[in-house]
Amino acid sequence: MTRTIQLDETIDVQRPLHEVFAYISEFSRIEEWDPAVARGVRSTEGPLGVGSQFRIDMKAGFSLRYSVVEWEPERRLLMTVDSKPFTAREEIFFKRTADGTRVRYVANFDFVAPLARLAEMFPGVMDRVGKSAMAGMKRALEDRFDPPRSVWGTVLADKLVVPGVLGFTRFGYRSARRHWNPV
């Protein structure tokens, strides 16, 4: 038994079409805008396009494998998604507007049993997941983040030099990364 759920969400952002397409098509950056994603990694080399693949690790503990199957620069992306709990076809449309870009995301998820039964019982869960991801995408693309504030610990570490050097290590990178915003 399988159950198909379709998501269809649209956002408008005040950003040029070429920038929006470049940002979203580099799908390894999904962790910057989808709160359900722990990490995105590009699995293939070379220019982005048909055949590009990405491994997306979800916070729920499973991974997705995205494959780009159709690529129309600044117009459309079509990707297939393979994972244990579901398969999907995700299509993202891009359209220039008077003051920026419209992004439309259409996905068809096919859940396998027993998740198919859960999807029937709680149909709004996937809808909330889609809305949350698109809200995150809009936030990331609009890039209206407050500048970072200095905190006493960082200021003191920088003045004492040696503790400040820790910020330039792998430990410093990892701890600072939690506070970064998408570009």
Where are these regions (language model features)?
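Generic recognition of short, well-ordered alpha-helical interface segments
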Residues: R15, S63, R128-S132
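Amphipathic alpha-helical protein-protein interaction surfaces
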Residues: P16, E26-R29, P73, D99, ...
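Hydrophobic-ligand binding "helix-grip"
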Residues: E31-E32, G46, R55-R104, N108-A113, ...
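Terminal "cap-and-tail" regions of soluble proteins that handle hydrophobic small molecules
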Residues: T2-T4, T97-V183
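Hydrophobic ligand-binding cavity/cleft-lining segments
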Residues: M1-E45, L156-V183
